[in-house]
UniProtKB/Swiss-Prot annotation:
It comes from Xenopus tropicalis (Western clawed frog). Belongs to the vinculin/alpha-catenin family. Residues 941-951 have a biased composition (Basic residues). This is Catenin alpha-2. The lineage of its organism: Eukaryota, Metazoa, Chordata, Craniata, Vertebrata. It holds the Pfam family Vinculin. The gene is ctnna2.
Length: 966
């Protein structure tokens, strides 16, 4: 970079026709369009019009002449105002005038005789010369703008040098004030230039340089003041020199970006996706070969070499200190699986070459039908590399979860030692702080290595570079404070560097979060919290206060990070049911679970730290710890609610079948048993496969009914329509009850099933009340009777679910044997038939019949059958009851809408003023404001271009060259 006294050098060739700003492009585009249109006149051959009388050509020629005149007027004005490029601009204006006159003459001659190839060729050459002249004029005008910016930079450089040469604090304050004024002017001019730059990389460089200038300007004053106040402390000079260097580099960055010069090698090092991700992408592309041209001698060594380089990178990650033992074993296992899959694939290629099993048509596409052994081997190879990617991502997330936890603690400890004036401790803690910073940079680079997000990787690497350069200066500020602990200036300097460090760490953290998957983060965080919970319990039992306190702090930090990241993630979505459920889960963890956990930790530490052992309820602590784990897991379940099966396939911690059926009305979940024990749900999960298959058949029928309800409620906006809201609630509860029969879902015990049945009955009663109000207002007797009949069905099937749930409650696990209490079942069975008889008697014969009686009244429930058959009968009854109720709800929703339309049809607008429920069509399904992109899509995504084709002048000129033959 030039010094303060060096002349301004424009790194720009005036003869170059490269367009670097959007303004020049937009100004040139109309002229290019007009000239191109004129040149292409009658390009399709002779027309039916009279020769030599093309009115359109004359109009186009006149428009070109007018556009040229406008450029001349603006060019002359710019030339008068410019000081540095005055001669060049005047020369360019004269050239445009000369070429414009030539173009006017040749275009007029061509317009008179558009079929003449000679006149057309002459006009093409004139058009090319005119476009070149206008382009050069605009580029020179653009260079004049850059010169004005460089002049501002020169003034700022001189002001910076003046600040550096200040001799006392008063002089510094005066000079810094002048520097600040020039900074404001420079920022305004640079911002305008940034918006005009055509190259997005140059815009990014300009934005980064402006940000660095603003950031370091705040540190410039305190660092200079500390140096003037304490010149005998070497650390103050290091601080000041660092800040001055950063400001100078920022000024140079603005100058380079403004002129759109090539980036330096350092900046080029920041570009591109991660090395390991790129290697895996390349390997995945290389394994798909043409079997007819496959050569083992040619392809085997290169593929094996590429794979071994990938495995070497994976091994380095596996051997890192923060990688868990189980994760290391999984990475090693996946590496071995990938090796074996490659050998199997190469063998299949050899077999295809040897036996020639590929058909000609298949060879053209490069693939055979799905069942072909080679395709199977390719798919297996791809799956294994995908599995390896997943384990590497989880390993990286292990590092991130551990390293980006309580990132401010080493800094706070360092500052506290500096405030006490203990230079020895400061040096010791400085080493800890330096190791912490190095770890952040190392982990950030690891995250980059496996990421396909090119822009995100660039941001992370730049932020990591800033962290690396800022770390020594934070230590210098601490050393200054330690040497002069009573100095207000040293304290202010420390505060400024502290704030800057914290901001930079936040930038790095957010950048790392952007290139990692929130699903991976939640999965790893959940596992880490479970590890820490177990460590806490062990420390509590062993009376290890330090470990308990430290591990509990880690749990609080992990939970806080989960809450922060998920809240930020939800800002990418429009508000709706999905975001509401996720935010409710985070709110519960933040406001209820974590305060209770912190309270229990405090009680435990006080009890263990007391000289005389204090009584402490260990189970309360374990329950509070378990709730933290459950809270994080609930957040994860809520986040995964909208994931597709393909996205969930990469999450090995969740079984695919738990998410096969997802809709707007239900959320399916699973549960881990942290505490060993046989709940009713666990018993259901242990049924023989034959019994599970029968239950699955019933569940499939239930899902068909559920799909009908989904389709019906999806039509309507539930705001102002409690019937739709209740239908969704009932569907969700019924899904949980059917999940229970498969050993899944949130319902764990028979008491949970009974409570769920009660909730359904309550919702059914509320729906009955609303729908009867609709029926009362319906003037059509047939519609009214239909609706009432469907409501009677709901009452019947709600009662049926109550009975089936109570039957399950009578199944007791006594000494490992299940016993069915026949008396209780008989009483509920009798009560049910009394209700069913009343319902059928009160309904329309066309709507209800004895065939609808619930299956839970079958005699199998009274027998003393085996344990498995009893459980099967009970589960089947529960599912069928839910299916029948689901069907009744669907019919009720439809009938309620029909009845409402009849009412409005008869009473007109008066009905709209006081409707029981509001029937409005639902708006299109909400989508994320920011599209979630899979990591593998970053390289293959295609951005849609502008609808309007932009023809660059250079391209237009090259096209004209091809026309010279005319």
């Amino acid at each position: 970079m030039s010094s303060a006294t060096s002349p301004i050098i424009l790194k720009w060739d005036p003869k170059s026709l490269e367009i670097r700003t959007l303004t020049v492009e937009s100004l040139l585009e109309p002229l290019v369009t007009q000239v191109t249109t004129l040149v292409n006149t009658s390009n399709k051959g002779p027309s039916g019009k009279k020769k030599g009388r093309s009115k359109k050509a004359h109009v186009l020629a006149a428009s070109v002449e007018q556009a040229t005149q406008n450029f001349l007027e603006k060019g002359e004005q710019i030339a008068k105002e410019s000081q540095d490029l005055k001669e060049e601009l005047i020369s360019a204006v004269e050239d445009v005038r000369k070429q414009g006159d030539t173009m006017r003459i040749t275009s007029s001659e061509f317009a008179d005789d558009p079929c003449s190839s000679v006149k057309r060729g002459t006009m093409v050459r004139a058009a090319r010369a005119l476009l070149s002249a206008v382009t050069r004029l605009l580029i020179l005008a653009d260079m004049a703008d850059v010169m004005r910016l460089l002049i501002h930079l020169k003034i700022v450089e001189e002001a910076l040098e003046s600040v550096k040469n200040a001799t006392n604090e008063q002089d510094l304050a005066h000079r810094f004030k002048e520097f600040g004024k020039e900074m404001v002017k420079l920022n305004y001019v640079a911002a305008r230039r940034q918006q005009e730059l055509k190259d997005p990389h140059c815009r990014d460089e300009m934005a980064a340089a402006r940000g660095a200038l603003k950031k370091n300007a705040t540190m410039l004053y305190t660092a200079s003041q500390a140096f003037l106040r304490h010149p005998d402390v070497a650390a103050t000079r290091a601080n000041r020199d660092y800040v001055f260097k950063q400001v100078q580099e920022a000024i140079a960055g603005i100058a380079n970006a403004a002129q759109a010069t090539s980036p330096t090698d350092e900046k080029q090092a920041h570009t591109g996706i991660g090395e390991l991700a790129a290697a895996l992408n390349e390997f995945d592309n290389k394994i798909i070969l043409d079997p007819l041209t496959f050569s083992e001698a040619r392809f085997r060594p290169s593929l094996e070499e590429k794979l071994e380089s990938i495995i070497s990178g994976a091994a380095l990650m596996a051997d890192s200190s923060c990688t868990r033992d189980d994760r290391r074993e999984r990475i090693v296992a996946e590496c071995n699986s990938v090796r074996q899959a490659l050998q199997d694939l190469l063998s299949e290629y050899m077999n295809n070459c040897r036996y020639g099993t590929w058909m000609d048509e298949s060879c053209k596409s490069g693939r055979k039908e799905k069942g072909d052994p080679l395709n199977i081997a390719i798919d297996k190879m791809t799956k294994k590399t995908r599995d390896l990617r997943r384990q590497l991502r989880k390993a990286v997330m292990d590092h991130i979860s551990d390293s980006f936890l309580e990132t401010n603690v080493p800094l706070l400890v360092l500052i506290e030692a500096a405030k006490n004036g203990n230079e020895k401790e400061v040096k010791e803690y400085a080493q800890v702080f330096r190791e912490h910073a190095n770890k952040l940079v190392e982990v950030a680079n690891l995250a980059c290595s496996i990421s396909n997000n090119e822009e995100g990787v660039k941001l992370v690497r730049m932020a990591a570079t800033q962290i690396d350069s800022l770390c020594p200066q934070v230590i210098n500020a601490a050393l200054t404070l330690a040497a002069r602990p009573q100095s207000k200036v040293a304290q202010d300097n420390m505060d400024v560097f502290k704030d800057q460090w914290e901001k930079q760490v936040r930038v790095l953290t957010e950048a790392v979060d952007d290139i990692t998957s929130v699903d991976d983060f939640l999965s790893v965080s959940e596992n880490h919290i479970l590890e820490d919970v177990n460590k806490c319990v062990i420390a509590l039992q062993e009376g290890d206060v330090d470990t308990l306190d430290r591990t509990a702090g880690a749990i609080r930090g992990r939970a806080a990070r989960v809450i922060h990241i998920i809240n930020a993630e939800m800002e990418n979505y429009e508000a709706g049911v999905y975001t509401e459920k996720v935010l409710d889960a985070t709110k519960l963890l933040c406001e209820t679970v974590m305060p209770r956990f912190a309270e229990q930790v405090e009680f435990a530490i006080e009890a263990l730290s007391a000289n005389i052992p204090q009584p402490f309820e260990e189970n309360e602590f374990i329950d509070a710890s378990r709730l933290v784990y459950d809270g994080v897991r609930d957040i994860r379940k809520a986040v995964l609610m909208i994931r597709t099966p393909e996205e969930l396939e990469d999450d090995s911690d969740f079984e695919q079948e738990d998410y096969d059926v997802r809709s707007r009305t239900s959320v399916q979940t699973e549960d881990d048993q942290l505490i060993a024990g046989q709940s009713a749900r666990a018993i259901m999960a242990q049924l023989p496969q034959e019994e599970k298959a029968k239950i699955a058949e019933q569940v499939e029928i239930f899902h068909q009914e559920k799909s009908k309800l989904d389709a019906e409620v999806a039509k309507w906006d539930d705001s102002g329509n409690d019937i739709i809201v209740l239908a969704k609630q009932m569907c969700m509860i019924m899904m949980e009850m059917t999940d229970f029969t498969r050993g899944k879902g949130p319902l764990k015990n028979t008491s949970d099933v009974i409570n769920a049945a009660k909730k359904i009955a309550e919702a059914g009663s509320r729906m009955d009340k609303l729908a009867r109000a609709v029926a009362d207002q319906c003037p059509d007797s047939a519609c009214k009777q239909d609706l009432i009949a469907y409501l009677q069905r709901i009452a019947l099937y709600c009662h049926q679910l109550n009975i089936c749930s109570k039957v399950k409650a009578e199944v007791q696990n006594l000494g490992g044997e299940l016993i069915v209490s026949g008396t209780a079942v008989q009483s509920t069975f009798t009560t049910f038939y009394e209700v069913a008889g009343d319902v059928i008697a009160g309904g329309r014969d066309s709507q209800l019949s004895l065939d609808l009686l619930p299956s839970c009244t079958e005699g199998s429930l009274f027998g003393s059958g085996s344990r498995d058959s009893t459980m099967l009968d009970s589960a089947t009854s529960l599912i069928q009851a839910a299916k029948n109720l689901m069907n009744a709800v669907v019919l009720t929703v439809k009938a309620s809408y029909v009845a409402s339309t009849k009412y409005q049809k008869v009473y007109g607008t008066a009905a709209v003023n006081s409707p029981v429920v509001s029937w409005k069509m639902k708006a299109p399904e909400k989508k994320p404001l920011v599209k979630r992109e899979k990591p593998e899509e970053y390289q293959t995504r295609v951005r849609r271009g502008s609808q309007k084709k932009h023809i660059s002048p250079v391209q237009a000129l090259s096209e004209f060259k091809a026309m010279d033959s005319f």
